[in-house]
Amino acid sequence: AMSTIIYPSPVFGPVHSRRLGVSLGINLLPEDGKFCTFDCVYCECGFNKDHRPHRPLPTREEVYTVLEERLKDMHENGPHPDVLTFAGNGEPTLHPEFAGIIEDVVRLRNHYFPEAKISVLSNATQVLKPEVFNALLKVDNNIQKLDTVNPDYIELVDRPTGHYDVQQIIDQLKAFSGHVIIQTMFMTGSTQGKSVDNTTPEFVEPWLKVVQEIKPRQVMIYTIDRETPDHDLRKAGKEVLDRIGEQVREAGFEVSVSY
């Protein structure tokens, strides 16, 4: 049995994190399964095939109502959230009402906790949709995944479920004009007998070149930390992550490294 995580929907937490402070989670995906355009071998929610959802996506109205209730309660009784984070069982930007939900959340945040930030954790597959792109410009932390720029590695590790053209995605990430945080998972080990080590210069150098083209506000480097559905994956070591982080810093970008 895998100890993978399925998040309640549409609001969960708050979770206290060293990096983010008090984070209230918003899960726009079904609470009984996983809904994603990637099927990453390292996903803490498990493989798509093992978690097919049967419940519907929460509606925009439902998200608004539940979130307002929680924010009202936190306003009266604490704790005050530092950040409202769109995360959960898959890809939040897949929700057909994503843009409207972002508008609502911005409005609720401004009313109850104007100092709180809004973060979206995304795999970047939907940034080509204008309504998603424009909605992401309205959030404080637009966090987009780019594990590598190598198409074969993406097929092996991120396993897109539909058409995925990394160059198209990169061009669209550049179009954020710096209003984007790039998040990259580094690891070693293997999957299906093939190496997944993307910490070598062969992977890091082209990735860093693309980071310099995208010009993000920040780069988040991390490695696997919870149980993964594929047991042959290994964490990238602290020294390795620090070395990559240093290269990003030398290139002129703010960087956060999580071990």
Regions found by a protein language model. Give the residues of each.
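Conserved Radical SAM active-site core
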Residues: 42-138
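Generic detector of contiguous secondary-structure segments
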Residues: 6-7, 51, 86-89, 163-175
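N-terminal [4Fe-4S]-dependent radical SAM core
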Residues: 1-41, 46-58, 69, 73-79
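Short hydrophobic-acidic sequence motifs that mark active-site Asp/Glu residues
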Residues: 23-25, 83, 143, 181
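Short glycine-centered, acidic/aromatic-flanked micro-motifs in structured strand/loop junctions
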Residues: 28, 86-88, 184, 223
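Auxiliary Fe-S-binding modules of radical SAM enzymes
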Residues: 1-19, 65, 72, 188-259
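Conserved AdoMet/S-adenosylmethionine-binding subsite of the radical SAM
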Residues: 94-234
